Amino acid sequence: MSILSRAANKLQPGKTLLVPKNKFKVADEEWGHLPEYVVPAANKIVHPFYQYPNATERTALCITERNPKLFNGKPVLPAFVRHPVTSESTLVESRLSFDTVKDVSKWVQRIHKSGDRLFHKVNITSSDSGPKVRKTKLTSESPFVKQLDNFLNSHPQLSFETLDSELSKLFIFHKGQEVIYLEEIFLYILQRDNLTVPQWKATLKTLPKYVGKEIDDIDMLNTLLIQWVLSGEQLFTKIDTPALNLLWNVIKSSRESLNQNIITNLNNVQLDKLFDTFLKGKDIKVSRILLETLASRRIMPSLPSIEEYIELVGQAGQETDAGIVPLERKSKLYLLHVLSPVFASNLTCRMTDLLLPYCIHQSEIFALLDLALKSKYSKDIAKSCVNNFVLRIAQLKDSQVDNSLNISSLYYRIKAYNNGTVPNANLLAFIIALLTNSNFRAVQTIINEQPVKEITKVIEVVKNQTTFIDQFGFTGVDRETLLHFLNNRA
């Protein structure tokens, strides 16, 4: 009985007053005293590349007595929280703002542990690996096969009703003469060199009738499904959406017939092949299901496939009364969350460029930069993507002063990464970014540290920059001083 209950009993002897349990309070051993609808639990944050607060952010949180916050208290990190009334789990862009410093330390420890678990090592599938399906056991000498070939050759435009009817007749007729398994018949049809598109579709449409009956081996069923995909790729450049919908419906119906999960029984190579197939068909829903199954095995698709998935998420939309509209940022980040282990160690240039537009706060940009510079492809990223980081951070805020501070922080990180020298390919980008934000003094400091080759271009940009958004910080005098400095260097 709680302390409140015992106190109430003392006030009213002989009566028992039960104080209802607060269903929103989470056990202290889980993550602290803060209800989820105020601050999300550490393991409910689903950001794909922001692992946890860096050292500077952690220090700022823990030394701020009143109202410590991350991301300036703005809703940035996608997270699942429990609704304060319905208690339903809801995806939101959460505000990480605390009333006091009291519970911050525990929360920071838990998000750090959660991030370490999330960003574990995974095995990346090779892009040139693929499933191999054994040849059918049926041979051309079989009387059954000869009769089946004659039928298929004379029916190139085959419906599944006709195929089903003919298979039943042939199977019954030859059953007493030779041992024939129905799954071998389907495999034989799909492996024929002169297979037609109608025959290919009819084979899959006929299959569910026999699953759980004549075909009750889930491994054999998976072999047939993969062979159907491989045969389809020989017939088309890409399997179309109706055919993929048919395949997914067969997978779902087979699960019910066999009372087994078809997807979880696929081996890693088969699962990766299905993911790649639905990805090429731009089916984001099924692709995500297959990707999460791979991730649960600590397996990831090839890096080109991952890049294609990120692009697909970026294009994803949802149906509304007003038609199809783009998915919200929080939903897209949630769809990318499963790729966190890849971003932690195998971030590529293409991935970096695709993820940058999701950054709406400088902490996200620097979190992505940290992963980029730790990646095994860091040299390529540093060579190709730094200017995109500069462009993104230079336009992040309305305040030219705030933008300048962020540009300077990025400049010194890149300088440290390159052992004290910013590459010329990036130097001009930093200078133009600072000029765009009217920070003329910082430009002069940079050029004093490291001369710039395109001095004429810098002078031209300075002359064109006449807008001062901030009421303080940068002035026209600074601009004239810089022009004089540059003209002396030209």
UniProtKB/Swiss-Prot annotation:
Q: What is its main location?
A: mitochondrion
GO function term, MF aspect, one? translation regulator activity
Which keywords are on file for this protein? Mitochondrion, Transit peptide, Translation regulation
UniProt keyword tRNA processing present? no
* Chain's gene name: AEP1
Can you name a GO cellular component term?
Answer: mitochondrion
Name of the protein in question: ATPase expression protein 1, mitochondrial
The record's function comment reads: Required for translation of the mitochondrial OLI1 transcript encoding subunit 9 of mitochondrial ATP synthase.
